[in-house]
């Protein structure tokens, strides 16, 4: 089935990487896929050589079109099978009116079980099918040791990779880390952060302000351990090198449709601490943090009609997050055999999301 794939696969964002890997997954499964790029920012990465080749194909005589974009940008073509592909990180999305655009499609694909429930609660009437995201798993073996991380030596290193926005709940992560671990313990918190519209220096300053505010609010000691904060663009090989020197990935977000850095960590062999009752339930392996549905508040995402307090996201328990971080560290320190098994199981689970395996699933969905 010749398939037109519209997505922002050239953007250097999690959404862009998801679109890119889904195209590569379809191609690996033998689908005649024709990619066409749209963009939502000015941060573009080098084009994958396979994508460059696929872009030369004609859109003529396509049998299906996958719209991997915001539902308001969907356009129905009666000559094709029309498939919407979207994500959301909230319990419902009724207030966005996305369901009206989604219901124009023949079917919609989402990456996790939680989103199926959100679709049904939000008035989606067309078939909803799970289409997981994927990775080029070969990138995560024999990782080059090219990152200078002398601070990591002899320590248990927690890793966070994500945007410096409220939805990612970095404030909660800082509260949990500094409440649970004394500065004398050999434990680090490394954060690779970015913030759209801010320079590297401004991003680091914004993080410093947040960190100081958290420490001031905790009032439990006069001196705290410094976090290891890194901002700005890193080449993939440098970021993966940094991540490979860590022992546990942490994502305490209020909502995640997927979380590519978590899956990347698992592919390296690093377990994950993650917010439960989110899209991460579908694939993460490690320690699940209890959460409760709460009205969204102070979201900094770019669309003002999303993440309002008329809908809810999942707020993780800071106490349970701190406890999970302690368990991860103590398991590593006192029961290395158990820790190594958790790592091995995380890495094994990540193999289920290779481009090749997911490509076969997507091909079946296309023909379903």
Question: What are these model-derived regions, one by one?
Answer:
Residues 320, 327, 337-352:
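A short, well-ordered alpha-helix in the C-terminal region of glycosyltransferases
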Residues 4, 150-168, 174-177, 189-191:
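Conserved donor-binding/catalytic core segment of Leloir-type glycosyltransferases
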Residues 241-257, 267-271:
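Acidic donor-binding loop of glycosyltransferase active sites
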Residues 1-64, 188, 356-360:
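N-terminal pre-catalytic "stem/leader" segment of glycosyltransferase-like enzymes
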Residues 4-6, 37-122, 238:
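Extended catalytic core of nucleotide-activated donor transferases of GT-like folds
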Residues 271-274, 288:
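Short hydrophobic beta-strand element within catalytic cores of glycosyltransferases
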Residues 200-240:
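Nucleotide-activated donor-binding/catalytic signature segment of Leloir-type glycosyltransferases, i.e.
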